[in-house]
Amino acid sequence: MRVLIAGLMASVFAIAGVSAAQAADRVDQVPEAPVAQEAPVKPAGSWEGFYLGGAGTYNMGDFGSDRHTYGFGGQVFTGYNWQQGQIVYGVESDLGYSGDDVSSGGVENKYGWNGSVRGRVGYDMNPFLLYGTAGLAIGDVKVSDDTSDESKTNFGYTVGAGVEAFVTNNITTRLEYRYTDYQSKDYDLDSGSFSRGYDENSVKLGIGVKF
C-alpha cells in the first residue's frame, strides 16, 4: 500500500513539473507588442514643401522714352521647394496688380494685373535662403485717349534675385528684386495707332507660410 501511495505521489509531482515547464514556455512565447513607427519629420528650418504668401511691391516702370511711371502694387504667390543638402530649387507663380500709369501727348498708358511662372534656385544659409529666379511674365497694358481705349495681354520674361529668412519654423519673410520686360504691341485708338511695350524694375517685400 505504501508503495502504491508513493508511486501516485511521484506521478502527481511529475505531472505538476511538466505543467509548470509548459506554462513557462507559454509565458516566454508571448509576442511583444509592436513598436509604433513614427512618420518621418522634416528637420526644423527645412525649405522643402508647399508654401504661399503675399507681398507689397514698389514698381519703376517705363512705357518708352519720356513715359516713365512709379507706383505701388501687391501680389500673392505660391510655390513648392525641394531641398538636397544646402541646394534649394523649386517652382513659383504669382498674381498681382499694379496701378502704374502715365500720360503723354494726350494718351494714357496703364499697367494693370500681372503674373509670372518661374523657377527658383537657392543656397540655404539657415535661417537665410539666397536665391535667383527667372521665368515667363504676363501682364495687361491699357492705352487710351479721350474717346477710346484698348487693352492687350502682353507676354515677356522676368529675372531677379532675393533673400528669404525663417521667422518661425513655418513663417518666412522675403525681400526680392525683379526686372520684367514685355513685348511691344500696337494699339489702335481714335487719335491714331500707337506701339507700346512695358518694362519694369520692382522691389517686393513679402511674408509666406510653409506647409
Swiss-Prot record:
Gene3D superfamilies: 2.40.160.20. Keywords: Cell outer membrane, Membrane, Signal. Pfam families: OMP_b-brl. It is found in: Cell outer membrane. One of its GO terms (cellular component) is cell outer membrane. Residues 1-23 form the signal peptide. It comes from the Bacteria. InterPro entries: OMP-like (IPR051692), OMP/PagP_b-brl (IPR011250), OMP_b-brl (IPR027385). The keyword Transit peptide does not apply. Its main location: membrane. The keyword Signal applies. Belongs to the Omp25/RopB family. PANTHER family: BLL7405 PROTEIN (PTHR34001:SF3). This is 22 kDa outer membrane protein. The lineage of its organism: Bacteria, Pseudomonadati, Pseudomonadota, Alphaproteobacteria, Hyphomicrobiales.
